[in-house]
């Protein structure tokens, strides 16, 4: 009987024999059986195309803000009167150099530190002083024109309420913490916002900057309304509920140049760019960096353009029409982001006005390339400090006015009251601290200090007590 091992060995021998026969029969020239794959043609190198210069516009883009907005810094009605220097009597103990006379018929009205004011006691035993004007002999409280004027509550309570709002706490949450009515908190916010807008306008002007970044922050307004509403009104409120917070900043000093609420259209872009231009000096044209919003190009061209007469191309025929073109010193670049399925898939840079070499030269002080990273980081800070624009919160505003009021508060709080760790400077000599703590080695600085607008960190109480003069003051005041 033949074992199974015999058949296994026989099959193995047959396989080896077949392999040898195939190798002997197979042709040695493999090219005759398997021809080589033809080489693919090398790709034709793309020709470098110079960007086509901007031909210009036949008409200047309209800007409603330039035509209808009043002058943010009105000029004085007359020349300043002579200063009043006290020559007799004891030295004044109360500093009145930061107050102005509000009497419209006074010759010294609106002039700060002119020596025409002196303290005149506390009327009715109150907390605030009464001031006397030596020119018109009028009396007024030192809180006139501030949020503290006419309030029966303590000034510490008002300052703490406003501070909580500036740190991102909602109106109702602040009311519960301090056990006051929410309408009272809202009224204090409205009064503080009006005062702080004037504060920002007074200090932020004629700035010389190297770079400005601008971005839009998505926000949602609450569509909730008490009572019964019609279907058409509900649809209208829902359509206008999504809004954008327009933000502009200086990356070098992190100075917040402007904040506003509106839609993402050309009209809003024109309005916000107009606000930024009002802050800059007339001869200042920094490098502007934005996202890929195309209407921003028209807005910058409106405010930094000029009429240019093109040259003739032919000897005969009518002369070409004048063109509205950007001024030669305008530098503007965009960071265009491509998003698919809520994911960032591509980022490329686009130089709109100027050349790549001049744009890189403008970026040299910060040592970076074209980007909007600084203002993107600022967007997160704004969401953390402004309750109305936070993500997935229940502190939304019902109208644009409420959002603007909270943004006006944060605008001043960010620039003058909030020290930034990236702006601090080392002290020449460490300062000892109270107790057993380590010595102070860093000098805190705010964006306003880094930009040269002030020399100290303001407290929120000092900001709210500051009486804004009605017009700019001479240098050194």
Residue ranges of model-derived segments:
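Single-pass alpha-helical transmembrane signal-anchor segments in small membrane proteins across taxa
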Residues: 4-24
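Short juxtamembrane segments adjacent to a transmembrane helix
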Residues: 29-40
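Residue-level recognition of single "structural anchor" positions
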Residues: 42-45, 51-477
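Low-complexity, intrinsically disordered tandem-repeat tracts enriched in small/polar residues
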Residues: 23, 38-40, 53
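Intrinsic-disorder-associated, low-complexity terminal segments enriched in Asp/Asn/His/Tyr and depleted
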Residues: 4, 8, 29, 48, ...
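Cysteine-centered motifs
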Residues: 19, 34, 63-66
């Amino acid at each position: 009987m033949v074992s199974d091992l015999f058949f296994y060995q026989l099959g193995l021998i047959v396989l080896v024999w077949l392999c040898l026969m195939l190798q002997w029969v197979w042709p040695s020239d493999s090219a005759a059986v398997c021809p080589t794959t033809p080489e693919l043609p090398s790709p034709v190198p793309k020709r470098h195309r110079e960007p086509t210069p901007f031909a210009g516009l036949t008409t200047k883009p309209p800007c409603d803000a330039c035509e209808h907005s009043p002058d943010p810094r009105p000029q004085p009605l007359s020349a300043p009167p002579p200063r009043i220097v006290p020559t007799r009597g004891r030295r004044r103990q109360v500093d009145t150099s930061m107050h102005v006379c509000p009497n419209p018929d006074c010759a010294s009205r609106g002039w700060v530190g002119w020596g025409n004011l002196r303290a005149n006691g506390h009327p009715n035993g109150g907390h605030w002083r009464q001031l006397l004007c030596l020119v018109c002999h009028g009396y007024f409280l030192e809180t006139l024109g501030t949020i503290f004027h006419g309030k029966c509550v303590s000034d510490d309570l008002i300052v703490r309420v406003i501070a909580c709002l500036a740190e991102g706490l909602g109106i109702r949450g602040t009311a519960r913490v301090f056990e006051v009515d929410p309408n009272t908190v809202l009224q204090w916010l409205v009064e503080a916002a009006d005062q702080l807008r004037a504060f920002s306008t007074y200090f932020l002007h004629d700035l010389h900057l190297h770079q400005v970044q601008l971005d839009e922050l998505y926000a949602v307004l609450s569509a909730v309304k008490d009572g019964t509403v019609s279907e058409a009104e509900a649809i209208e409120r829902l359509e206008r509920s999504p809004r954008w917070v327009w933000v502009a900043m200086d990356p070098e000093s992190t100075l917040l140049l402007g904040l506003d609420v509106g839609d993402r259209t050309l009209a809003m872009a024109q309005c916000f760019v107009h606000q930024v231009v009002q802050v800059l000096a007339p001869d200042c044209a920094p490098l502007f960096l934005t996202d890929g919003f195309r209407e921003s190009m028209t807005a910058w061209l409106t405010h930094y353009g000029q009429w240019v007469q093109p040259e003739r191309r032919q000897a005969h025929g009518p002369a070409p029409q004048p063109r509205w073109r950007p001024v030669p010193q305008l530098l503007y670049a965009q960071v265009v982001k491509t998003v698919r399925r809520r994911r960032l898939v591509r980022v490329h840079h686009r130089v709109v006005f100027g050349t790549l070499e001049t744009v890189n030269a403008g970026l040299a002080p910060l040592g970076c390339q074209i980007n909007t990273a600084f203002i993107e980081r600022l967007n997160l800070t704004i969401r953390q400090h402004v309750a109305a624009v936070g993500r997935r919160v229940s502190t939304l505003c019902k109208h644009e006015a409420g959002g603007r009021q909270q943004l006006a508060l944060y605008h001043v709080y960010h620039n003058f009251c909030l020290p930034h760790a990236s702006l601090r400077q080392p002290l020449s000599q460490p300062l000892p601290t109270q107790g057993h703590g380590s010595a102070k080695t860093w000098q805190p600085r705010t964006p306003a200090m880094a930009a040269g607008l002030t020399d100290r960190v303001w407290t929120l109480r000092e900001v709210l007590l500051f009486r804004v003069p009605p017009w700019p003051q001479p240098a050194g005041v």
